A protein has these predicted regions:
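A short coil-to-beta-strand element that immediately follows conserved catalytic motifs
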Residues: 5, 98-105
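Active-site-adjacent beta-strand/loop module that shapes the phosphate/pyrophosphate-binding cleft
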Residues: 21-28, 111-130, 144
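Nudix hydrolase/Nudix homology domain
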Residues: 67-68, 79, 136-177
Length: 177
Protein backbone atom coordinates (compact mmCIF):
# COMPACT_ATOMS: atom_id res chain seq x y z
CA UNK A 1 0.00 0.00 0.00
CA UNK A 2 1.31 3.44 -0.92
CA UNK A 3 1.29 6.49 1.30
CA UNK A 4 -1.45 8.95 0.23
CA UNK A 5 -0.36 12.30 -1.18
CA UNK A 6 -1.32 15.65 0.32
CA UNK A 7 -3.25 17.80 -2.16
CA UNK A 8 -4.08 20.75 0.09
CA UNK A 9 -3.93 21.80 3.71
CA UNK A 10 -5.78 24.60 5.49
CA UNK A 11 -5.88 25.77 9.11
CA UNK A 12 -9.60 26.17 9.89
CA UNK A 13 -9.21 27.15 13.56
CA UNK A 14 -6.39 28.80 15.53
CA UNK A 15 -6.10 28.69 19.31
CA UNK A 16 -4.30 26.75 22.05
CA UNK A 17 -4.23 24.10 19.36
CA UNK A 18 -5.04 24.54 15.67
CA UNK A 19 -7.41 22.45 13.61
CA UNK A 20 -6.18 21.58 10.14
CA UNK A 21 -8.20 20.21 7.24
CA UNK A 22 -6.14 18.29 4.70
CA UNK A 23 -7.25 16.91 1.36
CA UNK A 24 -5.58 13.58 0.69
CA UNK A 25 -5.39 11.56 -2.53
CA UNK A 26 -5.12 7.79 -2.46
CA UNK A 27 -3.00 5.97 -5.04
CA UNK A 28 -6.23 5.11 -6.92
CA UNK A 29 -7.02 8.85 -7.31
CA UNK A 30 -9.81 8.97 -4.72
CA UNK A 31 -9.85 12.22 -2.72
CA UNK A 32 -10.92 12.54 0.89
CA UNK A 33 -10.76 15.12 3.67
CA UNK A 34 -8.87 14.50 6.89
CA UNK A 35 -9.18 16.78 9.91
CA UNK A 36 -6.57 16.82 12.65
CA UNK A 37 -5.36 18.88 15.61
CA UNK A 38 -2.01 20.63 15.40
CA UNK A 39 -0.46 21.12 18.83
CA UNK A 40 2.83 22.65 17.58
CA UNK A 41 4.81 21.43 20.60
CA UNK A 42 5.73 18.01 21.90
CA UNK A 43 5.26 17.02 25.54
CA UNK A 44 7.11 15.36 28.40
CA UNK A 45 5.52 13.03 30.94
CA UNK A 46 7.44 12.06 34.07
CA UNK A 47 7.25 8.83 36.06
CA UNK A 48 8.73 10.24 39.26
CA UNK A 49 9.75 8.12 42.22
CA UNK A 50 11.06 9.09 45.62
CA UNK A 51 14.13 7.38 47.10
CA UNK A 52 11.82 4.90 48.87
CA UNK A 53 10.10 3.97 45.59
CA UNK A 54 6.85 5.90 45.98
CA UNK A 55 5.39 7.32 42.78
CA UNK A 56 4.68 11.07 42.67
CA UNK A 57 1.38 11.36 40.78
CA UNK A 58 -1.22 14.03 40.09
CA UNK A 59 -4.93 13.91 40.74
CA UNK A 60 -5.87 16.65 38.28
CA UNK A 61 -9.25 18.14 37.46
CA UNK A 62 -9.75 17.73 33.71
CA UNK A 63 -12.61 19.78 32.31
CA UNK A 64 -13.30 17.54 29.27
CA UNK A 65 -13.66 14.54 31.61
CA UNK A 66 -15.60 16.65 34.11
CA UNK A 67 -13.77 15.05 37.02
CA UNK A 68 -10.47 14.40 38.79
CA UNK A 69 -8.17 12.11 36.80
CA UNK A 70 -5.05 10.33 38.06
CA UNK A 71 -1.96 10.91 35.95
CA UNK A 72 1.73 11.65 35.86
CA UNK A 73 3.22 15.13 36.01
CA UNK A 74 3.98 16.55 32.58
CA UNK A 75 3.08 19.02 29.91
CA UNK A 76 4.03 20.75 26.72
CA UNK A 77 7.66 21.44 25.96
CA UNK A 78 8.69 24.98 25.15
CA UNK A 79 9.97 25.72 21.63
CA UNK A 80 13.37 23.97 21.28
CA UNK A 81 13.33 22.73 24.89
CA UNK A 82 15.23 19.55 25.70
CA UNK A 83 12.74 16.86 26.83
CA UNK A 84 14.72 16.13 30.01
CA UNK A 85 14.87 19.82 30.99
CA UNK A 86 11.18 20.19 30.13
CA UNK A 87 10.31 17.13 32.19
CA UNK A 88 12.22 18.47 35.18
CA UNK A 89 10.47 21.83 34.79
CA UNK A 90 7.00 20.28 34.55
CA UNK A 91 7.66 17.95 37.50
CA UNK A 92 8.75 20.88 39.67
CA UNK A 93 5.97 23.25 38.56
CA UNK A 94 3.18 20.71 39.08
CA UNK A 95 4.44 18.96 42.22
CA UNK A 96 7.34 20.84 43.81
CA UNK A 97 9.45 17.68 43.40
CA UNK A 98 12.86 17.70 41.68
CA UNK A 99 15.20 15.01 40.38
CA UNK A 100 18.68 15.25 38.91
CA UNK A 101 18.51 11.53 38.07
CA UNK A 102 16.14 11.69 35.11
CA UNK A 103 16.27 9.94 31.74
CA UNK A 104 14.15 9.34 28.66
CA UNK A 105 12.62 5.85 28.71
CA UNK A 106 10.53 6.09 25.54
CA UNK A 107 8.44 8.23 23.23
CA UNK A 108 5.34 7.78 21.12
CA UNK A 109 2.49 9.52 19.33
CA UNK A 110 -0.43 9.04 21.77
CA UNK A 111 -3.24 9.63 19.28
CA UNK A 112 -1.77 9.78 15.75
CA UNK A 113 -5.19 9.54 14.13
CA UNK A 114 -5.99 13.00 15.48
CA UNK A 115 -2.85 14.70 16.88
CA UNK A 116 0.61 15.58 15.60
CA UNK A 117 2.11 15.63 19.12
CA UNK A 118 4.88 13.31 20.29
CA UNK A 119 5.22 12.53 24.00
CA UNK A 120 8.56 11.82 25.65
CA UNK A 121 8.35 9.54 28.68
CA UNK A 122 10.89 10.13 31.43
CA UNK A 123 11.81 8.31 34.62
CA UNK A 124 12.88 10.56 37.49
CA UNK A 125 14.55 8.62 40.29
CA UNK A 126 15.15 9.88 43.83
CA UNK A 127 12.70 12.77 43.47
CA UNK A 128 12.73 15.11 46.46
CA UNK A 129 10.29 17.79 47.54
CA UNK A 130 12.10 21.10 46.98
CA UNK A 131 9.28 23.63 46.81
CA UNK A 132 5.61 24.28 46.27
CA UNK A 133 3.49 24.01 43.17
CA UNK A 134 3.60 26.74 40.53
CA UNK A 135 0.45 25.99 38.56
CA UNK A 136 -1.02 27.64 35.50
CA UNK A 137 -4.41 29.33 36.14
CA UNK A 138 -6.24 26.47 34.41
CA UNK A 139 -4.46 23.72 36.39
CA UNK A 140 -6.08 22.13 39.47
CA UNK A 141 -3.68 19.48 40.79
CA UNK A 142 -3.50 17.50 44.02
CA UNK A 143 -0.26 15.59 44.57
CA UNK A 144 -0.37 11.98 45.78
CA UNK A 145 2.36 9.50 46.69
CA UNK A 146 1.48 5.91 45.77
CA UNK A 147 3.11 2.52 45.76
CA UNK A 148 3.25 0.57 42.52
CA UNK A 149 0.64 -1.82 43.96
CA UNK A 150 -1.70 1.08 44.75
CA UNK A 151 -1.35 2.40 41.18
CA UNK A 152 -2.12 -1.04 39.74
CA UNK A 153 -5.14 -1.42 42.04
CA UNK A 154 -6.52 1.95 41.03
CA UNK A 155 -6.08 1.18 37.32
CA UNK A 156 -7.68 -2.27 37.69
CA UNK A 157 -10.57 -0.84 39.72
CA UNK A 158 -11.59 1.33 36.78
CA UNK A 159 -10.77 4.65 38.44
CA UNK A 160 -10.52 7.71 36.22
CA UNK A 161 -7.00 7.34 34.86
CA UNK A 162 -5.10 9.34 32.26
CA UNK A 163 -4.17 6.81 29.58
CA UNK A 164 -0.84 8.56 29.11
CA UNK A 165 0.07 7.48 32.66
CA UNK A 166 -0.59 3.85 31.70
CA UNK A 167 1.75 4.24 28.73
CA UNK A 168 4.36 5.92 30.96
CA UNK A 169 4.22 3.07 33.48
CA UNK A 170 4.53 0.55 30.66
CA UNK A 171 7.65 2.30 29.30
CA UNK A 172 9.06 2.36 32.85
CA UNK A 173 8.45 -1.39 33.18
CA UNK A 174 10.36 -1.99 29.93
CA UNK A 175 13.26 0.16 31.10
CA UNK A 176 13.64 -1.87 34.29
CA UNK A 177 13.47 -5.35 32.71
Amino acid sequence: MKKPSLCSSEIVYRGFFDIRKDQIMRSDGQLFDYTCMVLHLDAAVVVAQTSDGLFVVNREYRQPAGDWVLGCPGGRLEEGEDPIKGGQRELFEETGYWSDDISIIGCCYPLPSLLDQKIYFLHAKNAILKGGQSLDPFEFINIELKTEKQLHQEIQAGSKIDGVMCAALWYKSLATC
